[in-house]
Amino acid sequence: IPAKKLSEIARELPPSPVKISASGEQRVTLECGRSKFKLLGLPRDEFPTFPSVRFNDSWRVKSGELQKLISHTAFAVSTEESRPILNGVLWELRDDRMRMVATNGHRLAKMELPVEGSTAPPGDLIVPPKALDQIRRLFPAEEELEIARGDNHLGFRSPFTSVFTRLVEGPYPNYEQVIPKDNDRYCLADKAALTSALKRMSVIASD
């Protein structure tokens, strides 16, 4: 079924029960109140198979912690195709912490959270930001996610939702070397005041 068209129809339907019926393999009818829609689907055989991600060796992460890491780093990902490795977010998994890093070569965002009793296999994963954005939006903060890795895929699931994504291949650049080690220049600022000032200045700032 065309996903975009189905989403648009569902968004406009009234808060009433929806009856869904299928005739053949490629025709679906949706009925809600006095509204009736007929959709022409695609052959089932053309739908891609799910990646071979087995959750036997999975680990668990609180969705709220994952959302915090994503929202503080994914915005810095590069959108240029010349360096595809920077089009992903680096997710570092360690025994006692997990960290996400993103950079476009001009700016860098990094956030780290402590982890107690982690069962995640230590390693580095490079995840597409679009997949992380879907995870951030689909899973409530209070849920605990089950995560597993396949050959080149990553799977996230809760009792009712599953998300799979292909990982970005290749070694991530050594971002640590661009972060000053002995930097005595820093400042403390009120977050609300700084955010307000930046919003005012961005009105006249050029791209």
Which residue stretches match the model-derived regions?
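Structural preference for solvent-exposed beta-strand-turn elements
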Residues: 1-207
